[in-house]
Amino acid sequence: ADLNRYKLVVLPMLFMTKPGFAQKIREYVENGGTVVATYLLGYVDESTLCWLGGFPGDGLREVFGVTASELDTLYPGEGNRAIWVKSSQQSSIKDYCELLQPAEGTEVVAVYGQDFYSGHAAVTHHVFGKGHAYYIGARLDDAGNAAVLRAALADAKVHLRDLPQGVEYHCRESENARYHFYINTTQSAVKVQVESGADLLSGKNVLGSMELKPCDACAIEEKVK
C-alpha cells in the first residue's frame, strides 16, 4: 500500500513484519508522515524468525528512536501506571510493559510509575526526517492512548472533532461538495455540532447543530465553492 496517502498510520502490536515493510515506514516518516506504534513491534519476520540486533527490528529502531530491551508480562490483577512528563497525568497499565531505551534526541513523553523500572520511559516521541514517530511501550488505558493519539493527530495536522461518546464521524468529498456522516451508536439521544447544509437522509436543512436519536444517523451535504 502507498502509505503516503495517509497523514497518520497506526501500528498496534505489529509483532510480525515482512522484509521491506520497515523501509516503507522509514520513507513515510522521513517524508513527513506521522506514525504511532505500540509494544511488540517488529519482533519477528514472516517465518517467525526473530529480527537480529534488537527490537523493534529491521531498522525500525532508528525510525522510532527507541530500543525495547525487555518485556514485562503482567499477571491478571497486576498493573502499573504511566506518568506524563509534562502534565503529570496518570494512566493505568495492564498486561504488557516494555522497558524502553530512548536514543539521543528522543523525547520521553511518559514514564513508568512503579516496579523496578519506575522512572523509565513508557511512551516516546521521535522526530525523524520531516515526520514524527510515537512509541507506546505499554498497554495503556483508553485515556492514555487518547492522549498519545491527540498529540500525533496534531503533528499530522488532522483536525480532531469533539464528539459525544459513542458518535462516529466520517467524511467523503466530491468535486463540489463534502459529505459528513454522523452515526449515533448509543441508546440515548445526543446533540452534535455539524456543518451547515442539507441532511440527505431527512431532506431538512441543518444550521450548525442537530439532535440524533438513539441509533440514528445523518448525512450532511456541504457545498464547496
Which residues are covered by each model-predicted region?
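A short, well-structured beta->alpha microelement
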Residues: 1-2
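A conserved amphipathic helix/loop scaffold
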Residues: 12-225
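Conserved acidic residues
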Residues: 7
